[in-house]
Amino acid sequence: MKRYVFMLSDGTGITAETLGNSLITQFENIQFEKITIPYIDSTHRAESVVLRINQCFSEQGTKPLVFMTLVDPEIRQAIKKAHACVFDLFSIFIGPLENELEEKSSYTVGRTHGVANVKSYSHRIEAIDFALSHDDGIKTRGYDKADIILIGVSRCGKTPSCLYMALQYGILAANYPFTEEDLVGFRLPEVLRPYKPKLFGLTIDAQRLQQIRSERRPNSKYASAEQCRLEVTEVEAMYQRENIPYINSTKYSIEEISTKVLAIAGLQRKI
């Protein structure tokens, strides 16, 4: 079974996507065709979106699902005229909140992902810049400013996790990869030892590591099963010897890896 899913927003669409995806992923036997439409900022644009939704209904004969985060009541009403099952994620919560807080909402578009807080936005940019300039052990100077330093073998999820922590949490995250040369008589590299309290390890199942590396450099020693097993075994042994906290990233998304790392490390959101 296939169902169309529309994620509609008067802003970036990130909130509608996040909430919508969280809900539909609970239905594993249904194939969803997802369509995100951001910046629906007028009734005219809303009407064109309704035409598109109705076309999907006509072609398939089943109502598309619509998850919308639209502030303007007129635009919301326009969308609700579509032949669809509409989930108004804004009005579901804003009414009860107004009652509880005894204050009317400002009904301002784009507050969640806009630049309403300049200080917070600047810190986010600083964190992203830090993650990029301290990626893959490129620059170890500045590690004293890091909130956390992810370490691990190549291709275990360090870079995307650092970028996610920077973007979503404002965390200054660096990462350092262990190379084949590091693994000869493997010990914690001396460049990392002064920052040991900031170190957090990632590991990964050797079989999964081989799959990932084979996509990048097939038929190489780097991607061989033996090399992957050796690196994972040596790195995990070092984590245990040095009492460095670590998690296995194999079955987790980048979002889950980042959240688990921050929770275990005791780091709090900065933005």
Curated annotation (Swiss-Prot):
<dbReference type="InterPro" id="IPR005177">
    <property type="entry name" value="Kinase-pyrophosphorylase"/>
</dbReference>
<keyword id="KW-0723">Serine/threonine-protein kinase</keyword>
<dbReference type="GO" id="GO:0043531">
    <property type="term" value="F:ADP binding"/>
</dbReference>
<keyword id="KW-0547">Nucleotide-binding</keyword>
<dbReference type="GO" id="GO:0016776">
    <property type="term" value="F:phosphotransferase activity, phosphate group as acceptor"/>
</dbReference>
<dbReference type="GO" id="GO:0005524">
    <property type="term" value="F:ATP binding"/>
</dbReference>
<comment type="similarity">
    <text>Belongs to the pyruvate, phosphate/water dikinase regulatory protein family. PSRP subfamily.</text>
</comment>
<dbReference type="GO" id="GO:0004674">
    <property type="term" value="F:protein serine/threonine kinase activity"/>
</dbReference>
<protein>
    <recommendedName>
        <fullName>Putative phosphoenolpyruvate synthase regulatory protein</fullName>
        <ecNumber>2.7.11.33</ecNumber>
        <ecNumber>2.7.4.28</ecNumber>
    </recommendedName>
</protein>
<feature type="binding site">
    <location>
        <begin position="152"/>
        <end position="159"/>
    </location>
    <ligand>
        <name>ADP</name>
    </ligand>
</feature>
<keyword id="KW-0418">Kinase</keyword>
<comment type="function">
    <text>Bifunctional serine/threonine kinase and phosphorylase involved in the regulation of the phosphoenolpyruvate synthase (PEPS) by catalyzing its phosphorylation/dephosphorylation.</text>
</comment>
<keyword id="KW-0808">Transferase</keyword>
<dbReference type="Pfam" id="PF03618">
    <property type="entry name" value="Kinase-PPPase"/>
</dbReference>
<dbReference type="InterPro" id="IPR026530">
    <property type="entry name" value="PSRP"/>
</dbReference>
